[in-house]
Every structure is written in C-alpha cells, then in structure tokens.
C-alpha cells in the first residue's frame, strides 16, 4: 500500500456470543468459522485499507464478553480510537446491555469527552430469522444515546461487515480533523522571531 498509513485502534465490545470474533475474522480474513470458541481475554488482528483517500492500518481488538473476564479485557480499552458496541438481534438482553458496555468503556478507557467519542453500533446475526430486537428499536437507541451510526450485520454472509468497519474509520478521521483544527488555532510558532521589546533600566 503506497503512502503514509495511520494506525487506528478499534475495539469490539458486547455480550459473549453476539459474534464479535466472527465479525473481526470475516472482515480481516473474509472467512466464517462455525466452530469459533468464546474469546478468553483479548485478541487482535490488523487490516490495511484505504477510506476516502486515507491509508489506514486498523488494529481490531476483540474482547471477551463474559463478566468473569472483565479484569482481563478492561486494561486494553485505553488508547482506542473507536468502539464498536455489538449486540445480537436474536438476543434482547445483549441489546439491553449496550448501555452498560458503553459506560464500562468510557470509564476504563478514561474517555475525556464521551459525547464526541466515535461509537458505532452493530446489530449482528441478521441472517437468523427469529429476531428479538427490531431495527426501529436499535435505531431509536442510537438516536437517544449519541446519534450513533447503526449497522445490521451478518458475519455469516458478510452483510454490512466491511461497511461498518469503514464507517468506524470515517468517524475517527472526522474526530481527528476536528482535533487538528482546534490544535492549529492554539499552536505557537517556534520559528517566528520574537518582536523586539524595550525596557528601562
């Protein structure tokens, strides 16, 4: 890949069994493994891509969703550029737990400005016909909790998987653009010669 590449850390959070590992593997390797076991602690994979002319290396972190693994996963939240909150559309409890996952991430990642941090919401397993969470419910949650982008995905058949991760990159880039603008307005030019000053002795 030509050109300078930025490294973005993206973390997948959500209940155990919602398909976080499958989503990561589908996106990075374009494979789906029906025998995938629950993650213990954390795992990550890298993916090089170009989004809107920006070359990016996305470091995707997959975390264990079970409560007993909390102490293993939370140290890895820091330094994340984007968080993909994930639930399964056939599991209403995993949807109800999104708020808890968001709070846990904000606390352990030490997010300074939660209202502007880029979250993307994924409703996974739309290939399953019996759903417990409607599209409208999920969209309403996203509107009420920060106007987050929402994608209904299937790691099994790859529906919207690439689109969701690419949107995560766009959100990070937009956040960086805002930060750069703020920084540029307050920078000090170290190369500018100081104005001569007069003093009386």
From Swiss-Prot:
Primary location: membrane
What, per the annotation, is the impact of changing residue 66 to L? Loss of interaction with HPS4
- One GO location term (cellular component): lysosome
Q: Does the keyword Phosphoprotein feature in the UniProt annotation?
A: yes
Does Protein transport show up as a keyword for this record? yes
* Listed SMART domains: RAB, RAN, RAS, RHO
PROSITE patterns cross-referenced by the UniProt entry: RAB
**Cofactor(s) the protein needs:** Mg(2+)
Motif extent (Switch 2): 64-78
Which SUPFAM superfamilies does this entry report, sorted A to Z?
A: P-loop containing nucleoside triphosphate hydrolases
Residues given in the record as Mg(2+) binding sites: 21, 39, 62
Q: What is known of its domains?
A: Switch 1, switch 2 and the interswitch regions are characteristic of Rab GTPases and mediate the interactions with Rab downstream effectors. The switch regions undergo conformational changes upon nucleotide binding which drives interaction with specific sets of effector proteins, with most effectors only binding to GTP-bound Rab.
Please identify the protein, giving its name as recorded.
Ras-related protein Rab-9A
The top of its lineage is: Eukaryota, Metazoa, Chordata, Craniata, Vertebrata
Tell me the name of the encoding gene.
Answer: RAB9A
């Amino acid at each position: 890949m030509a050109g300078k590449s930025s490294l973005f850390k993206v973390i997948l959070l959500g209940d155990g069994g919602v398909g976080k590992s499958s989503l990561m593997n589908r996106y990075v390797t374009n494979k789906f493994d029906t025998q995938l076991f629950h993650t213990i602690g954390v795992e990550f994979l890298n993916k090089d891509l170009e989004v809107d002319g920006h070359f990016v290396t996305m470091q995707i972190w997959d975390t264990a969703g079970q409560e007993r693994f909390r102490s293993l996963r939370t140290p890895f939240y820091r330094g994340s550029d984007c968080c993909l909150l994930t639930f399964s559309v056939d599991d209403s409890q995993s949807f109800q737990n999104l708020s808890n996952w968001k709070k846990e991430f904000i606390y352990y990642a030490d997010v300074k400005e939660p209202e502007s941090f880029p979250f993307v919401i994924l409703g996974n397993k739309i290939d399953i016909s019996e759903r417990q969470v409607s599209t409208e419910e999920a969209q309403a949650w996203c509107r009420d909790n920060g106007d987050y982008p929402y994608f209904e995905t299937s790691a099994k058949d790859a529906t919207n998987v690439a689109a969701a991760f690419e949107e995560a990159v766009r959100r990070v880039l937009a956040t960086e653009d805002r930060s750069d603008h703020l920084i540029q307005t307050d920078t000090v030019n170290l190369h500018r010669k100081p104005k001569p000053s007069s003093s009386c002795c």
